[in-house]
From Swiss-Prot:
Pathway: Porphyrin-containing compound metabolism; protoheme biosynthesis; protoheme from protoporphyrin-IX: step 1/1. It holds the Pfam family Ferrochelatase. Keywords: Cytoplasm, Heme biosynthesis, Iron, Lyase, Metal-binding, Porphyrin biosynthesis. It comes from the Bacteria. GO terms for molecular function: ferrochelatase activity; metal ion binding. This is Ferrochelatase. Belongs to the ferrochelatase family. Coiled coil: none annotated. Its EC number is 4.98.1.1. Fe cation binds at H220, E301. The gene is hemH. Catalyzes the ferrous insertion into protoporphyrin IX. It is an enzyme of class 4 (lyase). PROSITE patterns: FERROCHELATASE. It comes from Rhodobacter capsulatus (Rhodopseudomonas capsulata).
């Protein structure tokens, strides 16, 4: 990291270096374990499942169950799942690899838009590394006096966008000199985001010999109770699917909206993806495609769960062709959509 410093003509000779003032753009995603061994997985899962935004059961009830039972077994199974998709060359999860690529491309686009050295673009993870606090400290050291915080979740949910913001605010509470700060709201309805989604579907469909009978839009699930308590996530997922269908020019029954990654015994948003694809196969729809509009980058939930477990369930039920449409990742249209979000939210700070 190279830091350019200002020369202060009226400062005493022993005055510490003062960085050139900059604007920061800090992207945030969910997180990833550092490795696939038991203790790395346990640390990661403990941080994730101890988040009150994710699991809001009473602490006295949840923590004994988590520490004594869940974290004694789940790190083994989760570690095996991560090993099946691990980027061995870089020794990191695909989410980490893809997020680095996204930031590299967005950084170049921001530099083209605002000039070299004026805006610092970096990323953090809500759970695991790089932590929000560590990256915030690094950005402050580079002279960022204003920071735009961008959770990479197109749809808002308390368990994703809000907890990322919480962690950013907690990090701000721990620094002596706070920068000006803004957070970016959900962006699921932006035409540029919908265009990127639609284009990804069209590219994949163009490679297929036979058009799938249906496109399943699988979103990460959450307890139905959270929806009843006011979380807008379910509504935003439904609208995302509708906007995607309208942009593609498809009929009303061409996209099914489902929810995955159910955890625990509580009722979650339905229909469940794994059950729905089985029902499709049993109903004679043997050729399907699946897309994950809520994930900005491919990760354990898409590469292992959708393209592994859910694919297997579909094929076991008699399905013949299962096409997975990758996440937007570092696709140029996705980066352009993110740049548009950044430009809009930096207005008044830098032009």
């Amino acid at each position: 990291m190279t830091i350019a410093n200002r020369i202060l003509p009226h400062a005493p000779a022993d005055h510490p270096p003062v960085p050139v003032p900059r604007v920061g753009v800090l992207l945030a995603n969910l997180g990833t374990p550092d490795a696939t061994d038991y203790w790395s997985m346990r640390r990661y899962l403990n941080e994730f499942l101890s988040d009150r935004r994710v699991i809001d059961y009473p602490i006295w009830k949840w923590q004994p169950l988590l520490q004594l039972i869940i974290l004694s077994k789940r790190p083994f199974t989760s570690g095996n799942n991560y090993r099946s998709i691990w980027n061995e060359e870089r020794d990191e999860s695909p989410l980490m690899t893809i997020t680095r690529d996204q930031v590299r491309k967005l950084r170049a686009a921001v530099e083209t838009r605002y000039g070299a050295g004026n805006v610092v673009v970096d990323f953090c993870m809500r759970y695991g590394n790089p932590s929000t606090r560590d990256v915030l400290d690094d950005m402050l050291a580079q002279g960022c006096e204003r920071i735009l915080f961008l959770p990479l979740y197109p749809q808002y949910a308390g368990a994703t966008s809000a907890t990322a913001n919480d962690q950013f605010f907690r990090a701000l509470m721990q620094v002596k000199r706070q920068p000006a700060a803004r957070t970016v709201p959900e962006y699921f309805a932006r035409p540029s985001y919908i265009e990127a989604l639609a284009s990804s579907v069209e590219r994949v469909y163009a490679t297929l010999d036979t058009r799938p009978d249906v496109l399943v839009a699988s979103y990460h699930g959450m307890p139905k109770r959270y929806h009843r308590e006011g979380d807008p996530y379910h509504c935003q997922c439904q609208k995302t699917s509708r906007l995607l269908r309208e942009r593609l020019g498809w009929g009303p029954d061409s996209i099914d909206t489902t929810f995955q990654s159910v955890f625990g015994t509580e009722e979650w948003l339905r229909p469940y993806t794994v059950e729905h694809v089985v029902q499709l196969a049993e109903a004679g729809k043997k050729n399907i495609a699946v897309i994950s509009p809520a994930f900005s980058a491919d990760c354990i939930e898409t590469l292992e769960e959708i393209n592994g477990e859910i694919r297997e369930a579909f094929e076991h039920a008699g399905g013949e062709s299962f096409t997975y449409v990758p996440c937007l990742n570092d696709d140029d249209l996705h980066i352009a959509a993110l740049l548009e979000v950044v430009e809009e939210n930096l207005a008044g700070w830098i032009d």
